[in-house]
Regions:
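Active-site C-terminal subdomain of aminotransferase-like
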Residues: 40-146, 150-153
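Conserved C-terminal alpha-helix-loop-beta "cap" of PLP-dependent enzymes
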Residues: 122-214
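Generic structural signal for hydrophobic core residues of well-folded globular domains
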Residues: 116-119, 164, 218-221
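Solvent-exposed, charged interface segments at domain starts and junctions
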Residues: 3, 12, 104-106, 122, ...
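Conserved PLP-enzyme active-site core in the AAT-like
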Residues: 1-82, 146-147, 162, 170-176, ...
């Protein structure tokens, strides 16, 4: 409300999987919402290509870049989906087009649509619940190690930041990699003030045994069980 009172729009970046548990951004007053669609059934693929998601309130639809899928009916009265509100520039003047989406992104958008249709609301809720529960378990286990602490004491979904009190994150993560475990992402490579921190992500695919193995491995590098 504070943003809208001064004429500003509210933009939100969200994790699509989290909506299996949380309210939609639009229900919280968000005007434009963006997301990385990689979590919707796409494997790692050596870092890409992936797909982006962007949605907004109806009054802004015609200003969206990209291709917009709309619902209509065919001549037999059956529901179908089409690319709608397409400008002429998308087909005849590429330099002025708002969308130059290539086949790669189209294929991954289709993959995401298939994944969502197969999962359904119940499936997405189950995946989101598993992500949240397993991440919470991993964070609680990390908090038992004297060497580490949670850097941000805020609610989280499936990612959390761990601080290494010995400030030796590169060596710590290399130690884990040498044992074929990707323990986390060092944040110091982007933010100098987070040089002693790394990000851990836990999804529905990780087992309790794998989480316990990670915690044990990190503890064996000098953390020690408390």
């Amino acid at each position: 409300d504070a943003a809208h009172q001064v004429g500003a729009l509210v933009v939100c970046c969200f994790d699509p999987t989290s909506l299996g548990l949380l309210k939609r951004p639009g229900d919280l007053g968000v005007d434009i919402a963006v997301a990385e669609g990689h979590t919707l059934g796409t494997p790692m693929l050596y870092g890409g290509p992936y797909l982006g998601i962007m949605t907004c309130r109806e009054e802004f639809v015609r200003r969206l870049p990209g291709r917009i899928a709309g619902q209509t009916v065919d001549r037999s009265g059956r529901r179908c989906w089409v690319l709608t509100l397409q400008t002429r520039e998308q087909h005849i003047r590429r330099e002025k087009a708002t969308s130059n989406i290539c086949t790669n992104q189209g294929l991954f958008a289709l993959r995401a649509a298939v994944y969502l249709s197969l999962m359904g609301p119940a499936g997405m809720k189950q995946v989101a619940t598993l992500c949240q529960q397993k991440a919470a378990y991993a964070a609680a286990q990390m908090d038992t190690l004297d060497r580490f602490e949670l850097a941000i004491e805020k609610p989280f979904f499936k990612e959390f930041v761990v601080r290494d009190k010995q400030n030796d994150v590169p060596s710590l993560l290399k130690y884990c990699r040498d044992k074929n475990v990707l323990a986390g992402v060092p944040l110091g490579q982007w933010y100098s003030e987070w040089d002693d921190c790394f990000l851990i992500s836990v999804t529905e695919k990780r087992t309790k045994e794998e989480i316990d193995q990670l915690v044990s491995l990190l503890g064996s590098h000098g953390g020690g069980q408390s």
